[in-house]
């Protein structure tokens, strides 16, 4: 018999079915054919069964399609990006979810260490620039400093608990003056409490100067997406970098002239010409801090403060990734200048705690480098020696500014500054502004600023006890008068010695409205002058308020009436400076609300205006309740007019700025409290001996003071820039127990919502 034909067999044969390496659980139990489709096979879909794949012990060599792995990686990457964006935008904004957000951040970070990441495109070896996905941002390659290795996961599935912070604020801080105003308001409402007010006054001051209620620590920079080796070397387009450098040296680089522009631009041009193949890590970090500072302050480029801060955080995170650890291990002039730039940036970016801590590191590094010693600079060439000296002077000035703001002891004594020249003309350096004039305008500005901050330091030592003790120095009206008189003479002598092109300006003059770099320096000097004048005369205003509302001063008994009258007369000097500050800023911002006006950075303007507003509020309290039954209507009208100008300033100063909104809201609430009508009734009743003076105040005043107390416990971050995180429930210690109990129930939610700004 002939064998069967191959052709006949081929007609009846069928194609082999594809072998499935792993069948789903349902098909294996039913012993049916499984097509292996993920996530659900066709059989399970048709039977509406739950399709699950569980590899057995023999499935170690199961082959999974590459496309499936790629899809999983893509999905995980997208989820991670969404989580990062949510954490970045909403951490601190959803107060009720603060704990959950922190845990989500840790969980997401742990998940990233375990899950595979989509590999980034490899950098071409022949190109010096690494492009991002859109190809628009270059990357610096070939960093000369060794890159710090990231810490590896310890495998313990550790979850960090919340960190808490508390702080000390001394007599020069705004929080101290605000406490005094609130205590005075409380005593106006409750005259009977004056009898026992002085018994525990010293103990109360000692306790309230410490922020006893801690708050959880959140870092807005840490909440942003991770900065990897590639991200931290990313640079904006060359045109954008050129623009930001130009803006820096025209603004901040003139106010703080400690970086030589020509040398900086030469290094920048060299790195750019070499496609950033070789660049010092410190230089790249310094460049990013400059970009962060300009990005946060350039209102003309981005009107919204929130958007500017988001963009600024990107540059700041790159800078810290590059130089944060390096600055603790290496000492060089570039590292010191980097730290000074970080202090300036943090002070203007509502990171006051970072500014204070990093300033300490900058001072130590500068001393280790010998910047405080003229002999150590003798071996340097003239240019290096001059800019080393300028760096030390800027550190000294920042030390005094932060010491006043925080109410804490200064680090650098005046004995370390004896070798500073009396005029910058002795060491004049050529600058673009001085071309053809032979005058180093930034150098002269730094020299006169240095002498002004020396007067500020004298006020700290003589009037505020150097902010050394937890309590205010024992108030002595005679010593306060003598100190303020001497410091006022020094301040006026400083003003008279200014060069003609840096003379102080008046609010009604034409100079503030003419936008030039020199006029901007004059306006800044004028604002600094009046701010220090308020600092010098504020102790006299405090003595007046204590005498009128807090039972007077037991120390100055002899001739107390005469001394108090002198103190009251001198206290008006602080109000005059507050008036000049508000009117000057109001005139400039009404004429030109753009970021190119003569005010400079909005943050520092906000600081000066807010400090002046507190002085005006003190004068309102004095005029409304401090001189018998009749209020000083003339002074009240003038002060309320000034606060009306302050409200206009806050509206025009910046857009979408939560700190400005908070300042405006706080001033308005303080004004309501200080002008409460029932307080007058309380004073009148107390003077007439009416027993009703000891009865609880009206519901209106109780509500206002409850609101103020409530703001004191939660709505106080507006002080962070200059009072250094004023958050302190001690502001409410002198208020009625009923008000405290009424607000306690709502305190937590309000506190969290405000701190989330």
Swiss-Prot record:
It comes from the Eukaryota. One of its GO terms (biological process) is positive regulation of transcription from RNA polymerase II promoter by galactose. One of its GO terms (molecular function) is RNA polymerase II cis-regulatory region sequence-specific DNA binding. Residues 112-150 are annotated as: Disordered. InterPro entries: Fungal_SecMet_Regulators (IPR051127), Transcription_factor_dom_fun (IPR007219), Zn2-C6_fun-type_DNA-bd_sf (IPR036864), Zn2Cys6_DnaBD (IPR001138). Induction: Expression is induced in response to 2-benzoxasolinone (BOA) exposure. Keywords: DNA-binding, Metal-binding, Nucleus, Transcription, Transcription regulation, Zinc. Transcription factor; part of the Fusarium detoxification of benzoxazolinone cluster 1 (FDB1) involved in the degradation of benzoxazolinones produced by the host plant. Maize, wheat, and rye produce the 2 benzoxazinone phytoanticipins 2,4-dihy-droxy-7-methoxy-1,4-benzoxazin-3-one (DIMBOA) and 2,4-dihydroxy-1,4-benzoxazin-3-one (DIBOA) that, due to their inherent instability once released, spontaneously degrade to the more stable corresponding benzoxazolinones, 6-methoxy-2-benzoxazolinone (MBOA) and 2-benzoxazolinone (BOA), respectively. This is Transcription factor FVEG_08294. It comes from Gibberella moniliformis (strain M3125 / FGSC 7600) (Maize ear and stalk rot fungus).
């Amino acid at each position: 018999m002939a064998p069967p034909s191959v052709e006949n067999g081929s007609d009846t044969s069928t194609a082999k079915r594809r072998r499935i390496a792993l069948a789903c659980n349902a098909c294996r139990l039913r012993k049916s054919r499984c097509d292996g489709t993920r996530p659900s096979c066709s059989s399970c879909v048709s039977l509406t069964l739950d399709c699950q794949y569980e590899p057995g012990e023999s499935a170690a060599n199961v082959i999974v399609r590459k496309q499936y792995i790629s899809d999983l990686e893509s999905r995980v990457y997208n989820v991670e990006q969404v989580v990062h964006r949510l954490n970045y935008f909403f951490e601190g904004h959803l107060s009720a979810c603060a704990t959950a957000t922190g845990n989500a951040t840790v969980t997401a970070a742990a998940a990233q260490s375990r899950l595979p990441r989509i590999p980034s495109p490899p950098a071409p070896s022949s190109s010096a620039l690494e492009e991002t996905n859109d190809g628009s941002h270059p990357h610096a390659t070939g960093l000369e400093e060794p890159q710090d290795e990231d810490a590896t996961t310890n495998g313990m599935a550790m979850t960090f608990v919340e960190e808490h912070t508390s702080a000390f604020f001394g007599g020069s801080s705004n929080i101290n003056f605000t406490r005094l105003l609130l205590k005075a308001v409380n005593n106006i409402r409750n005259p009977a409490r004056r009898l026992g007010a002085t018994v525990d006054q010293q103990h109360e001051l000692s306790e309230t100067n410490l922020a006893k209620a801690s708050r959880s620590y959140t870092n807005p920079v840490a909440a942003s997406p991770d900065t990897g080796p590639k991200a931290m070397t990313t640079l904006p387009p060359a045109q954008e970098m050129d623009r930001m450098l130009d803006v820096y040296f025209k603004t901040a680089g003139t106010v703080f002239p400690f970086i030589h522009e020509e040398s900086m631009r030469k290094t920048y041009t060299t790195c750019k010409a070499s496609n950033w193949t070789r660049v010092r890590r410190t230089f790249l970090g310094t460049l990013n801090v400059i970009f962060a500072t300009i990005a946060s302050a350039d209102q003309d480029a981005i009107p919204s403060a929130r958007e500017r801060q988001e963009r600024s955080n990107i540059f700041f995170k790159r800078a810290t990734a590059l130089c944060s650890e390096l600055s603790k291990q290496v000492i060089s002039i570039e590292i010191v200048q980097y730290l000074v730039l970080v202090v300036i940036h943090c002070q203007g970016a509502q990171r006051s705690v970072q500014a204070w801590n990093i300033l300490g590191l900058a001072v130590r590094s500068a001393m280790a480098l010998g910047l405080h010693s003229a002999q150590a600079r003798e071996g340097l060439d003239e240019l290096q020696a001059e800019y080393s000296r300028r760096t030390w002077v800027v550190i000294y000035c920042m030390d005094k500014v932060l010491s006043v703001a925080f109410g804490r002891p200064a680090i650098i004594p005046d004995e370390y500054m004896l070798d500073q020249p009396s005029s910058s003309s002795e060491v004049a350096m050529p600058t673009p502004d001085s071309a053809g004039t032979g005058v180093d305008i930034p150098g002269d500005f730094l020299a006169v600023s240095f002498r002004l901050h020396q007067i500020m330091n004298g006020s700290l030592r003589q009037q505020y006890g150097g902010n050394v003790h937890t309590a205010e120095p024992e108030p002595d009206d005679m010593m306060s008068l003598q100190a303020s008189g001497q410091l006022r003479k020094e301040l006026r002598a400083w003003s008279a010695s200014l060069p003609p092109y840096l003379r102080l300006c008046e609010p009604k003059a034409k100079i503030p409205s003419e936008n030039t770099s020199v006029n901007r320096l004059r306006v800044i000097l004028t604002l600094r002058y009046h701010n220090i004048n308020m600092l010098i005369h504020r102790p006299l205003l405090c003595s007046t308020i204590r005498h009128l509302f807090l039972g007077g001063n037991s120390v100055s008994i002899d001739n107390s009436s005469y001394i108090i009258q002198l103190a009251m007369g001198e206290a008006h000097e602080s109000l005059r400076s507050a008036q000049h500050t508000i009117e000057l800023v109001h005139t400039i911002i009404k004429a030109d609300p753009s970021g190119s006006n003569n005010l400079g950075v909005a943050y520092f303007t906000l600081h000066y205006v807010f400090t002046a507003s507190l002085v005006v509020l003190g004068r309102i309290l004095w005029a409304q309740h401090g001189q018998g039954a009749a209020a000083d209507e003339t002074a009240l009208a003038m002060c309320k007019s000034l606060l009306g100008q302050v409200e206009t300033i806050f509206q025009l100063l910046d857009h979408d700025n939560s700190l400005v909104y908070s300042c405006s809201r706080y001033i308005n609430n303080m004004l309501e409290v200080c002008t409460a009508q029932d307080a007058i009734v309380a004073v009148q009743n107390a003077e007439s001996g009416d027993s009703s003076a000891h009865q609880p105040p009206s519901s209106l005043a109780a509500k206002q003071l409850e609101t103020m107390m409530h703001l004191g416990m939660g709505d106080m971050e507006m002080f962070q820039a200059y009072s250094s995180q004023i958050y302190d429930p001690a502001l409410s210690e002198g208020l009625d127990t009923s008000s405290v109990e009424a607000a306690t129930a709502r305190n937590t939610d309000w506190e969290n919502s405000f701190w989330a700004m």
